[in-house]
């Protein structure tokens, strides 16, 4: 509270490896690791879906729905969890897909139609399609007894997979269905940072009162959502989490497959907390190039930067910001991982772009209304516009983040 008052006072006184055009979703991610990183992950992380001895007895004889996408790969064999379940004789009655679809190829926010899995014949119900409300209703939820969740998150409040999971948990709580989460590591789980969502700004990119970088796995976050009565009407959801093995919050885990079209490698995933805010501005963050979320720029930033790129229409980004326009800005694709981890969620890039545009007399309209939804507070934008320093802006959320870390402690499954 003291920090927020300080911010108010300041107002008075004065945000390589992979080309998405040819990316094979089944070949996996860039696994460039520093020597230090390699020694840290000597023990292979075992994900929840590999621990069949724990969850198969829980679903025996029951009708099962699966919430997953292309990230639901089991172990080093990279067999999809759906195939494993079918082979084990589990009675699969539905597949539920998130943003980008079951195969992870659709554009951000694009409408994804219902379909049938060609391999198994199981219906795929899209929660990013025209039947979204219907699929959260009694008839669709009545298709199963247990919902299995096996999907790779990246630990950001504005990454939508957890939002879809919460909608499903709401529906399962309402209609008396069980939820079992096959937990996965959080690649950004080693820190907590960013403002906590003002629930007046609740949206599809901000659903729970948590920081931008919450530092929790989906299993831990689901436990907190239930324990803190964050589900609709405070409903209780019968929840079981199958935890990972050999994982802690300090484990730098390399994802085996890209979680979505524009996060093609670990560089993009680590920079995502700092570059996603550009989605609420007129600046491109590299969608439609071979370096999405690894660069940023705008045609009017030529006076500040010589590096350039031109967004094109590509699979997964068919209508990117500034399509066909030469953008000048910064290339962040070679910043060492250690440097990104140290800076955590940085506002330096948004501040740099804003100052550059302002110097050219182009700052009007720099921010869109989506920026406040992404950041979850209005003060971040307001302080950038008043040219406050990143240090001053970050000070505004430190107290509430410290309180959040205490509050979440009892829901954590990993050290």
Q: Can you say where each PLM-predicted feature lies in the sequence?
A:
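Glycine-rich, aromatic-lined ligand/substrate-binding cores of catalytic
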Residues: 245-325
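Glycine-rich, charge-decorated loop segments at or immediately adjacent to ligand/cofactor-binding or catalytic sites
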Residues: 104-109, 180-202
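Glycine-rich oxoanion-binding loops at beta->alpha junctions
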Residues: 113-144, 156
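Bacterial Sec-dependent N-terminal signal peptides
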Residues: 1-38
């Amino acid at each position: 509270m003291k920090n927020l008052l300080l911010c108010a006072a300041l107002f008075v006184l004065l945000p390589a490896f992979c080309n998405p055009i040819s990316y094979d979703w089944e070949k996996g991610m860039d696994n460039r690791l520093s020597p230090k990183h390699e020694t840290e992950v000597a023990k292979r992380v075992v994900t929840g879906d590999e621990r069949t001895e724990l969850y198969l007895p829980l679903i025996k004889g029951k009708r099962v729905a699966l919430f997953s996408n292309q990230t639901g790969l089991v172990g080093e064999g990279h067999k999809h969890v759906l195939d494993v379940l079918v082979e084990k004789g589990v009675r699969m009655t539905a597949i539920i897909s998130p943003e980008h679809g079951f195969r992870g190829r659709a554009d951000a926010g694009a409408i994804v139609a219902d379909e049938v899995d060609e391999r198994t014949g199981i219906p795929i119900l899209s929660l990013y399609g025209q039947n979204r409300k219907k699929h959260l209703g009694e008839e669709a939820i009545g298709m199963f007894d247990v919902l299995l969740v096996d999907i790779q998150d990246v630990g950001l409040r504005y990454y939508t997979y957890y939002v879809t999971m919460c909608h499903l948990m709401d529906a399962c709580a309402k209609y008396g269905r069980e939820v079992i989460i096959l937990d996965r590591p959080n690649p950004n789980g080693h820190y907590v940072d960013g403002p906590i969502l003002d629930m007046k700004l609740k949206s599809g990119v901000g659903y729970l009162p948590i920081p931008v970088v919450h530092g929790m796995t989906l299993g831990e976050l689901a436990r907190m959502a239930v324990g803190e009565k964050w589900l609709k009407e405070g409903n209780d959801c019968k929840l079981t989490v199958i935890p990972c093995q050999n994982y802690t919050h300090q484990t730098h885990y390399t994802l085996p497959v890209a979680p979505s079209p524009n996060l093609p490698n670990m560089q993009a995933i680590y920079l995502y907390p700092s570059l996603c805010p550009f989605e609420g501005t007129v600046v491109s963050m590299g969608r439609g190039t071979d370096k999405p979320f690894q660069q940023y720029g705008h045609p009017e930033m030529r006076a500040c930067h010589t590096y350039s790129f031109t967004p094109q229409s590509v699979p997964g980004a068919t209508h990117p910001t500034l399509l066909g326009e030469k953008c000048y800005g910064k290339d962040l694709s070679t910043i060492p991982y250690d440097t990104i981890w140290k800076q955590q969620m940085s506002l330096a890039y948004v501040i740099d772009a804003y100052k550059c545009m302002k110097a050219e007399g182009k700052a009007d309209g720099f921010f869109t209304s989506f920026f406040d939804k992404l950041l979850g507070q209005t003060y971040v934008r307001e302080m950038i516009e008043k040219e406050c320093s990143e240090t001053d802006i970050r000070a505004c959320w430190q107290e509430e983040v410290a309180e959040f870390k205490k509050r979440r402690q009892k829901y954590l499954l990993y050290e």
